[in-house]
From Swiss-Prot:
Residues 1-101 are annotated as: Disordered. One of its GO terms (cellular component) is mitochondrion. It comes from Homo sapiens (Human). A motif (BH3) lies at residues 126-148. It is a single-pass membrane protein. This is BCL2/adenovirus E1B 19 kDa protein-interacting protein 3-like.
């Protein structure tokens, strides 16, 4: 005899229990922990209206609004904010401190003031030179205009030059008073005549002696 084994069907309550256990053991979806929640269209609209009326809950964008362009706007806003923050950081890094900026401005002002002072001194010196030159030219013109003119005299008087007085016995005081035979004339004339004769006699004797000595030595 052949026997046929027939397996009994599994109990239904066990399947239901297994389904419940599987549902309980499944982890919650990752979307619930994030800030974005996907909700059905109708339920999301209803919740949005309710939240708008109450005014106390935050607006949670739906998947349709994200796909319709909200995500692009959010990305653009984030990009702009990141660009602004980076530009601020670079500007803070590149821009000098207020003390350095003040020092640079002070140095620039000192340099410009020195340049202006040197230029002003040069201009003052040049101005003084020009004023002195103008004064000299004005003085020369005034001197030339105020000088006396060379006016010739009205009458010409011709005068002969004075002759030099020659020394002579005739114009002496003795000759004028008594002539040749006056006592004053004789007092001057006789001594001078005697002295002249004595000098002539002495000179003749001296010359004769000098001439006689070489002739005697030759013999």
């Amino acid at each position: 005899m052949s026997s046929h084994l027939v397996e009994p069907p599994p109990p239904l309550h066990n399947n239901n229990n297994n389904c419940e256990e599987n549902e309980q053991s499944l982890p919650p979806p990752a979307g619930l922990n994030s800030s974005w929640v996907e909700l059905p269209m109708n339920s999301s609209n209803g919740n949005d209206n309710g939240n708008g009326k109450n005014g106390g809950l935050e607006h949670v964008p739906s998947s349709s609004s994200i796909h319709n362009g909200d995500m692009e706007k959010i990305l653009l806003d984030a990009q702009h904010e990141s660009g602004q923050s980076s530009s601020r950081g670079s500007s803070h890094c590149d821009s000098p401190s207020p003390q350095e900026d003040g020092q640079i401005m002070f140095d620039v002002e000192m340099h410009t003031s020195r340049d202006h002072s040197s230029q002003s001194e040069e201009e003052v010196v040049e101005g003084e030179k020009e004023v002195e030159a103008l004064k000299k030219s004005a003085d020369w013109v005034s001197d030339w205009s105020s000088r006396p003119e060379n006016i010739p005299p009205k009458e010409f008087h011709f005068r002969h030059p004075k002759r030099s007085v020659s020394l002579s016995m005739r114009k002496s005081g003795a000759m004028k008073k008594g002539g040749i035979f006056s006592a004053e004339f004789l007092k001057v004339f006789i001594p001078s005549l005697f002295l002249s004769h004595v000098l002539a006699l002495g000179l003749g004797i001296y010359i004769g002696k000098r001439l006689s000595t070489p002739s005697a030595s030759t013999y």
